[in-house]
């Protein structure tokens, strides 16, 4: 949803943005499902130095405000809520 929204904000139509998002997610999912390599090696294999994936990953993997911090907080919140719900 957010990726589609960003694509639209960059000038793509909804259909173009959503199609790119679907293919990106499908491609990434297929890579990890159909490979014996781990996620780090797969990432390294598709990342060209100075390329578009490299630039996107530099933002997403920033230790101060990147996805690691966001995913950690989200997973911890879900785990906490799961514990709360298991007591009901």
Regions found by a protein language model. Name each.
Residues 1-18:
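Anionic-ligand binding region
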Residues 18-88:
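NAD(P)-dependent Rossmann-like dehydrogenase/reductase catalytic/cofactor-binding core
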